[in-house]
């Protein structure tokens, strides 16, 4: 890694700066000077991104696995992307997430990365960034959300939304009913469960 390259008398000041600032939360100088690979975990889950929110827990398991295999784990957040919460469009965020990942993967002392994804924005952003940075990478998808139920009928994130919109426009359901019907389509965290790009690319 870049950190190990700069761990030398020829670059003493840079070595000190690189090493010292990573010693304040549990890493040791011996670890950082051991030559062991530094594996990043690009964590895409947050309260703003419920599609990927479970990656906050899964990232800890990834961290444990990296340590078990002899690596040094360093976790960092990805730019948040959530299709339905972002206005005017989440498509712009895909590019921001990509650019942020490229800068992180190329500018920090990282030898490899585990990219946590789960929708049709975080997945391409992560894949493009890994290809651009040209470092070893594993993509971990969180999987789709569960199917929902409403009045005994199975509901899904795409078809039910269009049906609910039509029912509301006709006056067949009121606004709270509109919210309840659409809300039934997202009973758990995970990416959209329809045959759209979130499912096909994950």
Where are these predicted regions, by residue range?
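Active-site cavity-forming subdomains of large catalytic enzyme subunits
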Residues: 91-202
């Amino acid at each position: 890694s870049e950190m190990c390259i700069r761990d030398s008398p020829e670059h003493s000041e840079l070595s000190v700066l690189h090493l010292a600032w990573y010693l304040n939360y549990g890493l040791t100088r011996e670890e950082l000077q051991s030559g062991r690979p530094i594996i990043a975990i690009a964590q895409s889950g947050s309260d703003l991104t419920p599609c990927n929110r479970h990656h906050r827990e899964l990232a800890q398991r990834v961290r444990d696995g990296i340590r078990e295999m002899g690596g040094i784990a360093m976790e960092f957040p990805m730019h948040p992307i959530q299709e339905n919460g972002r206005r005017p469009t989440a498509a712009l965020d895909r590019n921001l997430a990509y650019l942020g990942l490229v800068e992180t993967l190329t500018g920090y002392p990282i030898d490899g990365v585990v990219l946590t994804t789960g929708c049709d924005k975080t997945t391409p952003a992560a894949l493009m960034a890994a290809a651009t940075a040209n470092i070893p990478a594993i993509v971990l998808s969180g999987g789709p959300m569960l199917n929902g139920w409403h009045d005994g009928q199975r509901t899904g994130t795409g078809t039910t939304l269009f049906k609910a919109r039509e029912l509301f426009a006709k006056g067949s359901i009121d606004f709270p009913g509109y919210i309840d019907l659409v809300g039934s389509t997202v009973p758990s965290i995970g990416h959209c469960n329809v045959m759209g790009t979130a499912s096909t690319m994950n």
